[in-house]
Each structure stands twice: as structure tokens, then as C-alpha cells.
Regions:
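Short, internal strand/loop/helix patches
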Residues: 155, 163-203
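Structural micro-motif
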Residues: 25-29, 42-45, 53-55, 174-176, ...
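Thiol-/selenol-based redox modules, centered on thioredoxin-like
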Residues: 79-81, 199-224
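Bacterial Sec-dependent N-terminal signal peptides
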Residues: 1-8
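Short acidic-hydrophobic, aromatic-tinged amphipathic segments that line or gate anion-handling sites
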Residues: 101, 177-181, 210-211
Length: 224
């Protein structure tokens, strides 16, 4: 599991510039969790000055665009993202839908894949495109070993561009559909690192997040 702290890059030119772990922060989208009110600029600046690594929960659309940041002063212990991911795994909170278009132009939404076991592999860019090829091949072998592989949908969501993927990714007879420019989706799910594999069951519930693909037992989640 990941343990992410979401900070901010900069509130805006007229407030301050600060470094962040993840993304640029639009100060006009930051709200108090308890009241639902927008946080005034001076209060927001004070919050960030007191805690430069402030954790902000995000409300996003299906493509990962941030609609709203939510600040909860009672959830600043460094495990805010882990709590959210754990709530997806426990089933207390539904795993959020996503909408992507593959590099081959196929439009896909998670909610349309009910009844399928879904594998989502998050990958980065640059050298990782070639370096992690053996890991993808291991996952492909696991899928091909199933007697009911048609019950599986598999995706790789890269942070790389489509051109970079087409130039550097060479997968032969792969079960995976490839998605480019996926940084926003990684941030949507509070994933602060790549080379992670998410497994989602037939009801759309997150089973787990895996760093080690050898621990993934697809057959345990499929009918015989």
C-alpha cells in the first residue's frame, strides 16, 4: 500500500510559491471539509506555512481533473492517502470510476467493466518503459494461464506520451491495452509511485494494490 502526503507547489503568484510532492494547487478550489466553505487566501497561506506538507483530499472527475481540494485539520497525521486507499479495499467507499482512451482510440470506463476482473498497471515514463517489460510479461503469463481469461480486462496506464509509448514499448500478443498521459489518474488514486498494479473485482471493488506482481493470484478471484 502507498502512504502518500499531498502537498502543494504554489498557491498562486499573489500568495506564495512552495514545493510539493505531487501537483500544482489551485487556491480557488480549496475548501474546509467540515463547513464546505472555500478557504480564504490568508487562512490558506497560514495553513501551508504551519504545515508545508499539508494533506488535501481531492474530488476529481472521471479523467482525474481536480474539481475540489478538501482540507481536514483532523486528518494531518501523514496517513491521509493510506486511509482513503484502505477504505476502497475494505469496501467502505466505492472505488472511483475512471474514463480513458487507449492509444488505439478505444474509449473505456471502469463502470462498464462490471462482471470482469480488472487489472490496472500504473507505469511511468523514460527508462521505465523498457525496464519494466519483464514485469508486464509476467502478468501476461498469469492471464494466459487462466482457463477463463476472457473474464479479465487489463490496462497499463503510463505517464508517458503516446509517441513515447509507441517508440519504446514492445509487447508481443499482450492482453494489456495501453493508455498514455496517465499522471492525473495516478494522482486521482493517491498513488505517489509508479510500477504498481491494482486489482479490481467483478463488482468494481478494489481488491488490493501490489508492488510485487508475484503475489497476484488471479485464479483466486475468478469462477472455475
Amino acid at each position: 500500500m502507498t502512504n502518500t502526503i499531498i502537498g502543494q507547489v504554489k498557491l498562486s503568484e499573489n500568495i506564495s510559491q512552495r514545493k510539493s510532492y505531487v501537483t500544482k494547487l489551485d487556491k480557488n478550489k480549496v475548501f474546509y471539509k467540515e463547513t464546505g466553505q472555500k478557504i480564504p487566501d490568508p487562512e490558506l497561506l497560514k495553513i501551508v506555512e504551519d504545515n508545508p506538507s499539508v494533506f488535501l483530499e481531492k474530488e476529481t472527475d472521471d479523467e482525474g481533473n481536480v474539481l475540489k481540494y478538501i482540507y481536514d485539520p483532523n486528518n494531518q497525521n501523514g496517513d491521509g492517502a493510506k486511509k482513503i486507499l484502505d477504505s476502497y479495499i475494505s469496501g467502505d467507499v466505492p472505488f472511483p470510476n475512471f474514463k480513458v482512451t487507449t492509444i488505439d482510440g478505444e474509449k473505456i470506463e471502469l463502470k462498464d467493466l462490471k462482471g470482469k476482473l480488472v487489472i490496472i498497471r500504473f507505469e511511468g515514463q523514460g527508462i521505465a518503459l523498457k525496464f519494466n517489460k519483464p514485469i508486464i510479461e509476467i502478468l501476461d503469463e498469469k492471464i494466459n494461464a487462466l482457463v477463463n481469461k476472457e473474464e479479465v480486462e487489463a490496462f497499463i496506464i503510463y505517464q508517458a506520451s503516446e509517441d513515447e509509448i509507441r517508440e519504446n514499448v514492445e509487447l508481443t500478443d499482450s492482453n494489456f491495452k495501453l493508455v498514455a498521459n496517465g499522471l492525473k489518474l495516478a494522482q486521482k488514486y493517491y498513488l505517489n509511485q509508479t510500477a504498481l498494479t491494482l486489482l479490481i473485482d467483478q463488482n468494481g471493488k478494489l481488491i488490493d494494490i501490489y508492488r510485487n506482481v508475484y503475489k497476484i493470484k488471479l485464479e483466486d478471484h475468478l469462477s472455475n
